A protein has these predicted regions:
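...captures the hydrophobic TM-helix bundle architecture rather than a specific catalytic motif
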Residues: 1-249
């Protein structure tokens, strides 16, 4: 009994969840504005640039762990509202994060694996630092990686379909940038560039299906927010049995 009460009254860190996005964004901003000068220090500069990017991803993982700890005592989770985002007529969208078992699981996977990739890339990208006399490539790679982590975090934690779409677009952009990163390396570079373009076109096809489904759901439920849709789903199913089939495709 004492253990159950202790768990149920455990610490809550839900209010920290926006930092899963803020930390990677801070990391990429640091390297955008300061990374060029830091790389002038040579190999030591590489370690700083890569280390800052890795630290940003690692701190995002720490926040994800804290969300998992919070769920132990509060399994119902929470929706954390950061700010009002879009208000058009009856449409009122907030920039909010959904903290539940599924989203936290994905946060842990994305930030955990992403941090390991960042650390590995510090050494892996060493030979690419001075490629074609462009030392900025090393910095750009880690900027793209931090941006990818931030976009993925929005994708897996957003509380509405429009935030999900923003994350989806960000991940698509980063995929294009990273797949085609070595676009100038001879025949291999041509293959990289073509693969990047193919990924971009494929994602744009996905955009059409995504938006079609999202606006069909909005037409059916009158909202883009996940928790509101889940609450209304049983009522809509009873009132119009065919509505959910149409909304779900």
């Amino acid at each position: 009994m004492f253990f159950e009460e202790a768990v149920s009254s455990g610490p809550q860190f839900f209010n920290l969840v926006p930092w899963i996005v803020f930390f990677p964004v801070l990391g990429l901003l640091f390297n955008i504005f300061l990374g060029g000068r830091i790389l002038e220090r040579g190999e030591a500069g590489e370690k700083i640039v890569g280390g800052v990017a890795s630290l940003a991803a690692g701190l995002s993982f720490v926040v994800a762990v804290l969300q998992a700890v919070s769920l132990i005592g509060h399994p119902e989770g929470e929706v954390v509202v950061l700010a009002e985002w879009i208000r058009i007529g009856e449409l009122n969208l907030q920039w909010a994060f959904q903290v539940d078992t599924l989203s936290v699981t994905m946060m842990l996977v994305v930030s955990g694996v992403g941090t390991l990739i960042h650390i590995y890339a510090i050494g892996y990208m060493h030979e690419d630092v001075r490629h074609n006399g462009d030392p900025g490539r090393f910095r750009r790679f880690f900027v793209f990686m931090n941006l990818f982590i931030a976009a993925m975090m929005i994708l897996v934690s957003g509380d509405n379909y429009m935030m999900l779409f923003v994350g989806w677009e960000g991940v698509g952009l980063c995929s294009y940038l990273l797949i085609g990163f070595w676009y100038e390396k001879g025949k291999d570079g041509i293959g990289n560039a073509l693969a990047a373009k193919k990924a971009m076109v494929t994602n744009r096809i996905g955009d059409f299906g995504f938006l079609l489904a999202a606006f069909t759901i909005f037409w059916t439920f009158g909202t883009f927010e996940f928790h509101a849709i889940f609450e209304k789903a049983p009522e809509v199913a009873v009132a119009n049995p065919g509505a959910l089939d149409g909304a779900g495709g």
